[in-house]
């Protein structure tokens, strides 16, 4: 039995004394101990070494005290497993030297044996579960097929992912073939994560908000829906789409246990659009963690009041920024823990 099961209760829609809290990218660069490991090991070495991934995953639990751990990894380990070369370049971010920018290249993309290619992730989950000793739940995650396609086609990060969009609109058959391959791999990957011991999973659709609503349904949501459908009876699924407030009504009917919202969508609008029955997660602006700790506390209180303490998970609206002071991150977590109605 997990000692602190606030997150799992919130995902089931049960009443809680206060909302659970965790932060996207909480095992990250704002932690000085993380930076020490970053100096010694490159990014994918940290992802692929179960001992390091475990150490990094547990770091924020010990240092800032959130109610859940999220496995240290990256959404781009999935395309790596699919025989697509992915590097992490300092100062650039993800770099794919051979983008999947033609129908012929899509044919060469494989649907792998996830145990063979991603066994190190499942090993890290088992090790992390042991290290956590049932203190808090462990969340596993994957990128949405659309978000992964964005990197695979664009070849790197982008504000517009114009090449990815062009590819989908000019080669829709090839685009859907690639999206289905990513979806099939992601389902197998997440099912193995569940077997290894994760207590919940989150789908990150970081770039869904770049699509207009009709294209979002076609190129993103229908693949996320497949993943939710395949997983929902085994584990609670959190569906997060940055800038995807326009799809909250459809997302709420998907079988997901919770929906993540960003800071551009007010709590009352998110509740209204999602029908008021589903658990919501979010939506503190990550840049607001630059504010003074006392201001963070007031803003967190306002956020919880706006969402209501039940069917709610306090989180940021996207990942924590790299140079946020640790004390401010802790002030965010503490403010949720100290919340009283």
Curated annotation (Swiss-Prot):
Recorded family membership: Belongs to the uroporphyrinogen decarboxylase family.
This entry's Enzyme Commission designation comes to: 4.1.1.37
UniProt keyword terms in alphabetical order: Cytoplasm, Decarboxylase, Lyase, Porphyrin biosynthesis
Question: Which chain positions carry the site (Transition state stabilizer)?
Answer: 74
Q: Which InterPro entries match?
A: UROD/MetE-like_sf (IPR038071), Uroporphyrinogen_deCO2ase_HemE (IPR006361), Uroporphyrinogen_deCOase (IPR000257)
The UniProt record gives the binding positions of substrate as 25-29, 44, 74, 151, 206, 318
- Family annotation (CDD domains): URO-D (cd00717)
Pathway given for this chain reads: Porphyrin-containing compound metabolism; protoporphyrin-IX biosynthesis; coproporphyrinogen-III from 5-aminolevulinate: step 4/4
Q: Which reaction does it catalyse?
A: uroporphyrinogen III + 4 H(+) = coproporphyrinogen III + 4 CO2
Picking any one GO molecular function of the record gives:
uroporphyrinogen decarboxylase activity
> From what organism does this protein derive?
Christiangramia forsetii (strain DSM 17595 / CGMCC 1.15422 / KT0803) (Gramella forsetii)
Task: Set out the biological process GO terms recorded for this chain's protein.
Answer: protoporphyrinogen IX biosynthetic process
Protein name per its UniProtKB record: Uroporphyrinogen decarboxylase
Q: What function does the entry list?
A: Catalyzes the decarboxylation of four acetate groups of uroporphyrinogen-III to yield coproporphyrinogen-III.
One Gene Ontology cellular component term attached to this UniProt record is: cytosol
């Amino acid at each position: 039995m997990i000692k602190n099961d606030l997150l799992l209760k919130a995902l089931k829609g049960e009443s809680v004394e206060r909302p659970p809290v965790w932060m996207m990218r909480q095992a990250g660069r704002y932690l000085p101990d993380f930076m020490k490991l970053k100096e010694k090991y490159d990014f994918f070495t940290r992802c692929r070494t179960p001992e390091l991934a475990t150490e990094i995953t547990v770091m924020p639990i010990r240092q800032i005290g959130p109610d859940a751990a999220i496995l240290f990894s990256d959404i781009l380990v999935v395309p790596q497993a699919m025989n697509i070369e992915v590097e992490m370049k300092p100062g650039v971010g993800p770099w794919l030297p051979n983008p999947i920018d033609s129908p012929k290249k899509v044919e060469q993309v494989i649907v792998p044996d996830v145990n063979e290619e991603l066994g190190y992730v499942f090993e890290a989950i088992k090790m992390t579960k042991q290290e956590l000793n049932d203190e808090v739940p462990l969340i596993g995650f994957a990128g949405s097929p659309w978000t992964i396609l964005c990197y695979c086609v664009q070849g790197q990060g982008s504000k517009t992912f114009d090449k990815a969009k062009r590819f989908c609109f000019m080669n829709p058959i090839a685009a859907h073939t690639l999206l289905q391959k990513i979806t099939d791999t992601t389902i197998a990957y997440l099912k193995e994560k569940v077997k290894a011991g994760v207590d919940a999973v989150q789908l990150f659709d970081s770039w869904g908000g770049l699509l207009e609503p009709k294209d979002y349904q076609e190129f993103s949501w229908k693949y996320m829906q497949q993943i939710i459908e395949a997983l929902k009876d085994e584990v609670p699924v959190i569906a997060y789409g940055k800038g995807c407030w326009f799809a909250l009504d459809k997302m709420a009917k998907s079988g997901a246990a919770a929906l993540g919202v960003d800071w551009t969508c007010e709590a009352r609008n998110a509740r209204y659009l999602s029908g008021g029955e589903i658990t919501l997660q979010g939506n503190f602006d990550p840049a607001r963690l630059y504010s003074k700790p006392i201001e963070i506390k007031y803003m967190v209180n306002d956020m919880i009041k706006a969402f209501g303490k039940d069917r709610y998970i306090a989180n940021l609206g996207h990942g924590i920024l790299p140079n946020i002071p640790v004390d401010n991150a802790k002030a965010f977590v503490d403010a949720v823990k100290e919340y009283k109605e």
